[in-house]
Amino acid sequence: MKLYTKISSGKFKGKRLELPSLSTTRSTKSIVKESFFNVIRDEIYSLTFIEGFGGSGVMASEAISNGAREAIAIEKDRAAFKITQSNLASLQSPNLKAINGDSFALLPDLINSQNGKVLLYLDPPFDIRAGFDDIYEKLVNLISQLKKEKIYMIVFEHNSDFKFGDEISAYK
């Protein structure tokens, strides 16, 4: 049985997107997605939105629907990536793309090579995939590799019991 979600606002509001298997991804809850874009909508127009752990690409799709200059979803899991590609292609937006690969390896060069500012959205598959036990330490290391002047904002979805240190205090 396939699972679906819908784009909640913007140009593509109501467009149905497929969700990958719950065994490899954890989709952002609709209430979180809607609340996030209600807050950020007026700021997103000049930004490149990068979804570091794309899953279905729903956040990148929502970003382009709400007027982001460009949106990119990165997904490592091959099966999830195929769904991401299909979802993004269904929107027929030239400013929306999917990349299959490791976010930790790809993000520093991708962000540091951008012409404009980036809104980086990170919702890693903590507690789901093998090898993600030290996910937050990896994220802190990733952030240390980014040029501050390229970042407009970094958004993390994380377990509520984890507290980031001063490493991210320089970012909005």
Residue ranges: model-predicted function:
Residues 69, 94, 152:
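Short acidic/polar active-site loop segments enriched in Thr and Asp
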Residues 1-66, 77, 82-115:
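S-adenosyl-L-methionine
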Residues 2-9, 19, 98, 119-123, ...:
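Accessory RNA-recognition modules of RNA-modification enzymes
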Residues 54, 78, 105, 126, ...:
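Short, glycine/acidic-enriched loop or turn micro-motifs at the edges of active sites
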Residues 114-172:
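S-adenosylmethionine
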Residues 70-75:
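Conserved SAM-binding motif I beta-strand of class I
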